[in-house]
Regions:
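Mid-domain alpha/beta scaffold segments of enzyme catalytic cores
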Residues: 1-260
Length: 260
């Protein structure tokens, strides 16, 4: 069985409280042997740590998500630094970023948390997991100011030019359920022709289900559907795509090889 890696799963979310262990088992049965779990708020960090300690193949990232701005306090940035110091098994800082789609999120506050988390990641040599909705140009500008920073823009929804600018900076893009919808023509075109070394696959569970799972809670076991779609778009072998994207995730997040 090919070892798939879900590079972005919120398996710690409340939607999985009733069947989290079963969801993990279904993922493993589907070949998803590793998952990267980014957090969204400081209150989530202890439970995420407990989950990733208890279950093999789950790797934590800690950060402050822009959509949950009302749950953050400036002190959480200091807390994040202390938390990272105390938890060396952390694979990334995130999920963090900018969201200019939701009008009730203060842009200035978002920028403050975002910039601080980029600096924290850069200082520690950790990659970042980025949320960028209607904010990619500003995110790109922030990344250019921090040469050497590594990471991924998850659920990429930008233009081909923005994708190339990310690749020029060494950043990867995360692709999930949206690519399975025929209406996503721009995204599908980018994925079809992009350099494979910059591609990560994700489910963003419990959100963003694929077209065959529309309206249902998404979960990591759906990742093979993403693999199949992307392989078809690229006229590529699914096994080769699975191996290449898993290798990309292991390289970015310094994950062990879970095929053994």
């Amino acid at each position: 069985m090919r070892a798939l890696i879900d590079s972005h799963s919120h398996l710690d979310a409340g939607e999985f409280d009733a069947d989290r262990d079963e969801a993990i088992a279904r993922a493993r049965a589907a070949g998803v042997l590793a998952q990267v779990l980014p957090s969204v708020a400081a209150a989530d960090w202890p439970a995420l740590h407990a989950l990733t300690t208890r279950q093999r193949g789950l790797y934590p990232a800690y950060g402050l998500h822009p959509v949950y701005l009302d749950q953050h306090a400036r002190a959480h940035l200091d807390d994040l630094q202390h938390w990272l110091d105390a938890h060396p098994q952390t694979v990334a800082v995130g999920e963090c970023g900018l969201d200019f789609h939701l009008s009730d999120l203060d842009p200035g506050l978002q920028r403050m948390y975002f910039d601080a988390q980029l600096d924290i990641a850069l200082q520690r040599g950790l990659p970042v997991i980025l949320h960028a909705r209607r904010a990619l140009d500003e995110v790109l500008a922030a990344l250019r100011r921090r040469p050497g920073l590594r990471g991924v823009v998850h659920s990429f929804s930008g233009s081909a030019q923005q994708a190339r600018q990310l690749w020029d900076l060494g950043f990867l893009i995360g692709i999930g359920g949206p690519v399975t919808y025929p209406r996503a023509q721009r995204l599908r075109g980018i994925v079809a022709g992009m350099p494979i070394e910059f591609l990560l696959l994700e489910t963003d569970s419990p959100d963003q289900p694929d077209s065959d799972w529309r309206g249902q809670r998404n979960e990591p076991s759906r990742l093979p559907r993403i693999v199949a779609e992307v392989a078809a778009l690229r006229c590529a072998d699914t096994g080769h795509l699975a191996d290449a994207t898993a290798a990309n995730a292991r390289r970015l997040f310094a994950l062990p090889d879970d095929r053994v």
